[in-house]
UniProtKB/Swiss-Prot annotation:
Coiled coil: none annotated. GO terms for cellular component: extracellular region. This is Polyphemusin-1. The modification Arginine amide is found at residue 18. It is found in: Secreted. Disulfide bonds join 4-17, 8-13. It comes from Limulus polyphemus (Atlantic horseshoe crab). Signal peptide: none annotated.
Length: 18
């Protein structure tokens, strides 16, 4: 199963899937 979530760091957001 793949989980995708949004990661925000220092004003920069990206999508992370594991």
């Amino acid at each position: 199963r793949r989980w995708c979530f949004r990661v925000c760091y220092r004003g920069f957001c990206y999508r992370k899937c594991r």
